[in-house]
Amino acid sequence: MIDDRKLQILRAIIQDYISTGEPVGSRTIAKKYNLGVSSATIRNEMADLEDMGFLEQPHTSAGRIPSSRGYRLYVDRMIEFERLSSEEEGLIRNSIIDGTLYEVDKIIKQTSALLSELTKMTCIVKAPSVHKSFVKSIQLLKVDDVSILCVLVTDNGVIRNTVIKVKSVPISEELIKISKIITERLKNLTIEQINLEVISNLNRALNGYEDIVNAVLPALYESLKGDETSEVFLEGTINIFNYPEYNNIHKAKEILELLHDKKSISELISDSDDMTVKIGDEIFVPEAKECSIISAGYHVGDRSLGTIALIGPRRINYSKVLSIMTEVMKELNETLKNK
């Protein structure tokens, strides 16, 4: 059990270390934080906190820094969310583009850029595989006498365009009719569910236009090639160098290699819809043991769709970053609600 005085001292150490990046000594806490106890008492309490695993001592310093366990206690029990400025609140409201006018992936990329700018951290987006998305519509548009543009829209707002070749392109009215029938037969199916039975039924419904059906479906599969796994993209990778923790060339190289390994990054990020904070030893990827990862899910309508995460060192301003993340995700999910 940790008593109130130890909690006060631990909070002061963490706040000071987040602010300065320098190991913290008992005299610093006594002078700056007016806790009503002597430097000697603080020193003894710090020794106890170290024995309990909440503090650790860097090899080259007499001061102490928070451990992963210390940060976890701080986030779970001591943190107070920082109030955002009116400028920050306005930027959040105005930067996430209108969900009725833009595709979901554009909105998500805009949001990741905003998060990266406001937090000065690297933003990671983990989007689902298109293969696991449902067909929303398929539209066929004439390009020339033997070419048709096929536009696939999925339920999560992903759009894929591909041009198919046919013997002869029907008139516009017929293309609209064909598009409508294909959409009716394929709507709410995943790409993986479009099997031989579905194709046979579609050919019967479009008797005389089998060449179009037989060109459309392979083209869709081809355009989605490589999308079998979750899509991961980054925003603000260079922000990692804002932190002195990565001034060391070895650490910088290690974190950059991790960020460019999409499989490892995908495994790092929680799929939970709720806001999740992982700190240091809680992350089961060796290269990220000195990192913190804050993630939250986003939705299209009622469907959980993907995850947005921020990655940085353990020493980040949790109260500010969590405030920003909370407001941005609230605005994003409100924007996507009616997609």
UniProtKB/Swiss-Prot annotation:
GO biological process: one example: negative regulation of DNA-templated transcription
InterPro entries listed in its UniProt record: GAF-like_dom_sf, HrcA, HrcA_C, WH-like_DNA-bd_sf, WH_DNA-bd_sf, WHTH_transcript_rep_HrcA_IDD
Stated role: Negative regulator of class I heat shock genes (grpE-dnaK-dnaJ and groELS operons). Prevents heat-shock induction of these operons.
Protein name from the UniProt record: Heat-inducible transcription repressor HrcA
Taxonomic lineage from the root: Bacteria, Bacillati, Bacillota, Clostridia, Eubacteriales
Keyword Transcription regulation belongs to the record: yes
Domain of life of the native organism: Bacteria
Disulfide bonds: none
Source organism of this protein record: Clostridium perfringens (strain SM101 / Type A)
